[in-house]
């Protein structure tokens, strides 16, 4: 497998594209474009900007950002509620199972 020559820091160009090759599938996986957004993955704020050239007032922008943050908090609280409920269900089920095993042997 060919290896890349070490880069000399005097000639290193940080803006140069990162090469990928078929011989290194791990790099291809790491550099592959991300798929559709998962509801569990936090959303990025790539479209969260304010420009006076847009047809949006500062108060509308702040309201939009506030609604987005409130929705994130609401989703996070719902996810935590589901996780806590699932954990409680698992603990109760294990407790019942262990109780049944102990009762059978007594």
Curated annotation (Swiss-Prot):
Phosphorylated on serines within the acidic cluster. Phosphorylation determines whether endocytosed viral US9 traffics to the trans-Golgi network or recycles to the cell membrane. Not N-glycosylated. Residues 44-56 are annotated as: Acidic. GO terms for cellular component: host cell; host cell Golgi membrane; host cell plasma membrane; host cell smooth endoplasmic reticulum membrane; membrane; viral envelope; virion membrane. Its main location: virion. A motif (Di-leucine internalization motif) lies at residues 29-30. Residues 1-61 are annotated as: Disordered. Residues 103-106 are virion surface. The modification Phosphoserine is found at residues 51, 53. It is found in: Virion membrane; Host Golgi apparatus membrane; Host smooth endoplasmic reticulum membrane; Host cell membrane. Pfam families: Herpes_US9. The chain crosses the membrane at residues 82-102. Residues 1-81 are intravirion. Coiled coil: none annotated. The keyword Transport does not apply. GO terms for biological process: intracellular transport of virus. It comes from the Viruses. Essential for the anterograde spread of the infection throughout the host nervous system. Together with the gE/gI heterodimer, US9 is involved in the sorting and transport of viral structural components toward axon tips. Belongs to the alphaherpesvirinae envelope protein US9 family. This is Envelope protein US9 homolog.
